[in-house]
Amino acid sequence: MRCQFCHNPDTWQIQGGQEMTADELLNQAEKYRSYWGEKGGITVSGGEALLQIDFLIELFEKAHARSINTCLDTSAQPFTRKGTWFTKFERLMKVTDTVLLDIKHIREDEHRKLTKFSNSNILDCAR
């Protein structure tokens, strides 16, 4: 998607970044455990987090093994019930404590104006 009101697209750095394993990322996150307390944890957002669903599954499974709560912040644009993707999504949901589902607009026509995409798969995900 390319939403009309996306925060600071002029600051995006599409190239670069630092690749990390799930364990490396969790080791970094755990440095803040005293800040988030017993019920806190990690939130994965985007861009669109579901574009990296295999990594999310690994990350959230390992987070749960460490008693870290998990939150997925998503527009659910990639959501589909087709093929193996839905099986992966179900596996991810088993280790996701909270989902923040960002529906840009409930009406199809208004959603298209804002994002240039349909909201049908997003609403399907919400079901």
Which positions does each model-derived feature cover?
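Canonical Radical SAM [4Fe-4S] cluster-binding loop centered on the CxxxCxxC motif
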Residues: 1-20
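SEC14/CRAL-TRIO lipid-binding/transfer domains and related phosphoinositide-recognition modules
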Residues: 18, 24-27
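A short linear-motif detector with a strong N-terminal bias
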Residues: 5, 21-23, 77-79
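Conserved AdoMet/S-adenosylmethionine-binding subsite of the radical SAM
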Residues: 26-34, 38-41, 46-127
